[in-house]
């Protein structure tokens, strides 16, 4: 048996999860015989870039300025469908696409929060949940398998099933950026350990998190297994360390919103747009 430890930061963790999923046995059957619907996130965009050289458009994001959306819609897809070896933008026909999916098909998304009980959730900053709001009833009722790709850095304390009702975009009085609610995601969470264990015959454990001097949001991982399998993972880690240090998302969606923006009409409590009802003393640069 062999044991190895390594650290990956932020984007490298996203690349690792994407690479492991792409090469795993759990993903292959859907590529061959089913439909795979991807919802845009930085981690999922790593996966679609590796799969089909097609980065995705991201919508909401947390930046140094708070919870924001993209400044412009951009031309990239926020929802991509992979079927019969081809990938296409289904933003304009999302509901029809979901109506044609069922058991034997796969939905792949990221998450903004996960807990120790296996629950995951997305931040919702617009009325009805935007594109994910369209997806939710189909994910709960049509037997579509859902994979939730997210780093252990998204782990929060407590139980999301209890927290979700307490976080409300409409009850919030002040927010740096748009106030948000949480929407649950029904499905299977794949963080770094689960992704690694699907990629190679190893046991994987996260044993520390943190970072300094450019390595913020790092994760320390230990793997154990036969030498051949451990070195298989280390070879992949070496490749990941040479990949771009920014997530491969659609360039048109990189810029964050500034007041006024296309989403202002739906966003609530944003202090940058003077929508807060308390604390009117922030400095806007």
What are these regions (language model features)?
Residues 2-84:
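N-terminal active-site beta-alpha-beta segment that forms phosphate/nucleotide-binding
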Residues 278-279:
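Long, charge-rich intrinsically disordered regions
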């Amino acid at each position: 048996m062999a044991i190895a430890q390594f650290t990956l930061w932020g984007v490298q963790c996203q690349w690792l999860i994407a690479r492991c999923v792409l090469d795993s046995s759990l993903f292959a059957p859907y590529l061959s015989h089913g439909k795979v619907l991807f919802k845009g996130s930085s981690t999922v965009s790593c996966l679609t870039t590796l799969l089909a050289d097609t980065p995705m458009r991201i919508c909401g994001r947390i930046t140094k300025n708070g919870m924001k959306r993209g400044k412009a819609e951009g031309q990239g897809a926020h929802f991509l469908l992979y079927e019969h070896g081809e990938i296409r933008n289904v933003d304009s026909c999302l509901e029809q696409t979901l109506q044609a999916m069922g058991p034997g098909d796969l939905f792949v998304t990221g998450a903004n929060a996960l807990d120790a009980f296996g629950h995951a959730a997305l931040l919702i900053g617009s009325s009805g949940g935007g594109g994910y709001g369209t997806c939710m009833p189909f994910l709960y009722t049509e037997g579509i398998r859902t994979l939730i790709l997210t780093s252990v850095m998204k782990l929060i304390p407590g139980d999301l099933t209890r927290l979700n009702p307490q976080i409300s975009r409409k009850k919030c009085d002040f927010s740096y950026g748009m106030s948000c609610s949480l929407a649950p995601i029904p499905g299977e969470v794949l963080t770094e350990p689960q992704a690694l264990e699907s990629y190679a015959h190893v046991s994987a454990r996260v044993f520390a998190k943190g970072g300094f001097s450019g390595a913020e949001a790092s994760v320390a991982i230990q793997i154990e297994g036969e030498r051949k399998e451990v070195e298989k993972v280390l070879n992949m880690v070496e490749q990941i360390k040479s990949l771009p240090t920014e997530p491969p998302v659609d360039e048109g969606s990189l810029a964050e919103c500034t007041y006024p923006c296309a989403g202002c009409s739906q966003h609530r409590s944003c202090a940058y747009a003077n929508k807060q009802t308390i604390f009117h003393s922030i400095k806007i640069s």
